[in-house]
Amino acid sequence: NTFTCCVGSGIENHGKYAEQIYSHDGKNTLWVNLFIPSVLNDPANKWVLRQETDFPESNRILFLLDQKNKEALNLKIRMPYWAKRMDILIDGVMYKRLPDSSGYLNLGSLARGKYRIVIEPEMELYTEAMPDNKNRIAFKYGPLVLAGQLGKNMPDPLYGTPVLLTDNKNLKDWIRPAGGPLQFELNGVGKPNDVKLAPFYKTYDQFYSVYWDYFTNEEWSRRQNEYEAAKKMAAELEARTIDYFRIGEMQPERDHQLVASEKSYV
């Protein structure tokens, strides 16, 4: 029930997205940047492009183009960095295209007429590591960050957030579907237990974790005592801490009613 700057930014985002769904060079080239249901109507150039999709719930994106200009429209669609391939059907015919140097698939010159274009960027699981720690990773599926569901009660500070323990480097063996769209779960690699994974944007009203520490069995046998001792020390310090104030961050300074001027900082 708070209204912080984060909430305002979250609301503002949607307006910003609308600014960038499409780009046009003012002539006959149109770029599709984002996959968001929308209608682009350009009376001056005599074409209308409708985009229909529930992405990322589904990877199917439909474009309905009504092109009435005598000059052909050059249509380019962004191929996301996370997509290994992207199927393209124009009026039911499959086309193969490679992205250009800017990462866009050129559908070619579309003459006057109506077109039904379907694209399906392939979404798959992969990991992304912290810049300073290659063994602290996040799980991603296409553009989505997956969060581990830790329940409504505060997890145990030592063992509530699992580590990943396996010698198997094949990510597809770590995670399996969990019965619903965009729902996954760890598969025998969580220590002390596996957890369910869901898109971060759908995770609320519970505790969660996004980053996971990964160990091989040999690394864990060497570091287990050290790792658990560090977590125990952090938990004990937190239990003894009355307050924690991060100077230089807006929200903590407001929470602590800090009054300062430019002379207050060194």
Q: Where are each of the predicted segments found?
A:
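Residue-level marker for the onset of beta-strands and adjacent loop->beta junctions
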Residues: 59-61, 73, 84, 103-105, ...
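Short proline/glycine-enriched turn/loop motifs at strand-loop junctions of beta-rich domains
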Residues: 70, 79-84
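Solvent-exposed beta-strand/loop surfaces of large extracellular or lumenal domains
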Residues: 83-108, 127-132
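Surface-exposed coil/turn segments at beta-strand junctions on protein surfaces, enriched
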Residues: 56, 68-70, 100, 110-112
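Generic beta-strand/beta-sheet core signal
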Residues: 66, 78-80, 89-91, 120-122
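C-terminal beta-rich recognition modules with glycine/proline-rich loops and embedded aromatic residues
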Residues: 1-64, 100, 120-266
